[in-house]
């Protein structure tokens, strides 16, 4: 039985080994730090299909000025303001960038792939695995909706939590501010129904495997 058979059924985190839990918490903290820094220190506009973060520079200034002047819809921004291809991100490129800067293996995949790839391919090619229930989600997980993905910063209460994402929606305060944090949102219905929860392999700990192993053992007995 391979690692996929163990990890696809994550259970409630137990106490686990202290070192394992510490490693998890440090990695979660790094992911939050990276995403927060991108939001606070770089001028990133939401650009559909955009894959490059913003920053201080002529092209970024021209992108921002163009967006303010023309006010194109999110999916028309790169077409209306060509300089924005150098200074914008969409939601899936944002989560890829955060994982990369946090030191995680993170090939790009679209939200369509996140929703439709089978667990085996997700694990083999992207080191991601589905988490079956929202009550098992935790900081660092990807919450995938139809056409959108967000990074979970923390659960608050019930089905609510804090998320950070690249967005061209109503939460955006203006050009250059496409990365937004939203607090205490309904995670089950943030952008329509929650379709899938994905967790990077390195965010699993040994305690997550125990319920899966026990369940398999009971079936074999």
Model features per residue range: what roles?
Residues 1-5:
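Hydrophobic membrane-insertion alpha-helices, especially the h-region
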Residues 6-108, 146, 213-221:
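N-terminal capping segments
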Residues 30, 104-180:
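...with weaker cross-activation on analogous glycine-rich loops/strands in unrelated enzymes
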Residues 50, 119, 183:
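Solvent-exposed, flexible loop/coil residues
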Residues 178-221:
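Low-complexity, Gly/Ser/Thr/Pro-rich intrinsically disordered linker/tail segments
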